[in-house]
Regions:
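Extended, highly charged
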Residues: 1-203
Length: 203
C-alpha cells in the first residue's frame, strides 16, 4: 500500500497513508532506509549536521487568504463514521508555547463543536500541551498547522524531554522557514498549507 490522494472531497484534497512504511518515512526525511535508526539518531542528537539545515525566522506574517470564523466549517474537516459527533481534524500539528518549557509540537484530534468558532480537543493528561495549559493557568494560544514539511510531521510525533523544542529537532533534518501568526504570538512553518489560530480559554 502507498499514499492515497483524493482529489476532491467537498472541494478539498485529502491525503492519507503518507508514510505507509519505514522506508517511505526514511526517504521523505532524506535518510538511508538501511541505516534508518543510527543515521536519524545522529542527526537528532546533533552528532552529525546537514548542510543548509536549521531554522530561519522570516520577517513576515503567515497567510495570503484569511477565512473568518463563521466559515470555519468550510475547512477540510472530515466526518468519518455515521454517528460521529461532528467533523474532525485528525492530523493537524499543534504548536503551543509553554511558559516554562518553551515551544511544543504535538498531534491532537479536534472536533468542530456546534458553535462555528469552537472546537473540542482531546488533550492527553501530563503530556506537552496539557503541561503547557497547566503552566499557563489554563489560557494558552495555539496554532494548528495543516500540510507541514515531513520533518515537522515526524518530530511532532516524538516525545523528547519537556525542554526540547520539536521544531528545533525538525530543523536538524532540514531547513525550516518560520513566519509569525496573525492573531497569536507563535511562529509556524512558512510552507504550511493552512493554519488555524486560536486560544484555549480555560473554560
Amino acid at each position: 500500500p502507498g499514499p492515497v490522494l483524493l482529489e476532491n472531497v467537498g472541494g478539498a484534497q485529502v491525503l492519507a497513508n503518507l508514510f505507509p512504511d519505514r522506508d517511505a518515512l526514511a526517504r521523505s526525511l532524506g535518510v538511508d532506509p538501511r541505516r534508518f535508526l543510527p543515521e536519524l539518531g545522529d542527526l537528532l542528537s546533533g552528532k552529525t549536521r546537514r548542510r543548509g539545515a536549521g531554522t530561519r525566522h522570516q520577517d513576515a506574517v503567515y497567510g495570503e487568504v484569511e477565512v473568518p470564523l463563521r466559515d470555519l466549517k468550510k475547512l477540510p474537516f472530515l466526518t468519518y463514521y455515521r454517528g460521529d459527533g461532528g467533523p474532525f481534524l485528525t492530523a493537524g500539528i499543534w504548536i503551543v508555547r509553554d511558559p516554562v518549557h518553551g515551544v511544543n509540537l504535538s498531534y491532537h484530534r479536534m472536533m468542530i463543536a456546534a458553535g462555528a468558532s469552537e472546537g473540542t480537543v482531546r488533550v492527553v493528561s501530563d503530556r506537552g500541551t496539557d503541561t503547557a495549559l497547566k503552566n499557563s493557568g489554563g489560557r494558552l494560544d495555539a496554532a494548528i498547522c495543516i500540510g507541514v514539511p515531513a520533518e515537522v510531521l515526524f518530530t511532532a510525533s516524538l516525545s523528547p524531554a519537556p525542554d526540547v523544542n520539536e521544531m528545533d529537532l525538525a530543523a536538524r533534518l532540514g531547513r525550516i522557514d518560520l513566519v509569525r501568526c496573525k492573531t497569536v504570538d507563535l511562529e509556524v512553518p512558512a510552507s504550511c498549507q493552512m493554519v488555524i489560530e486560536g486560544t484555549f480559554t480555560g473554560e
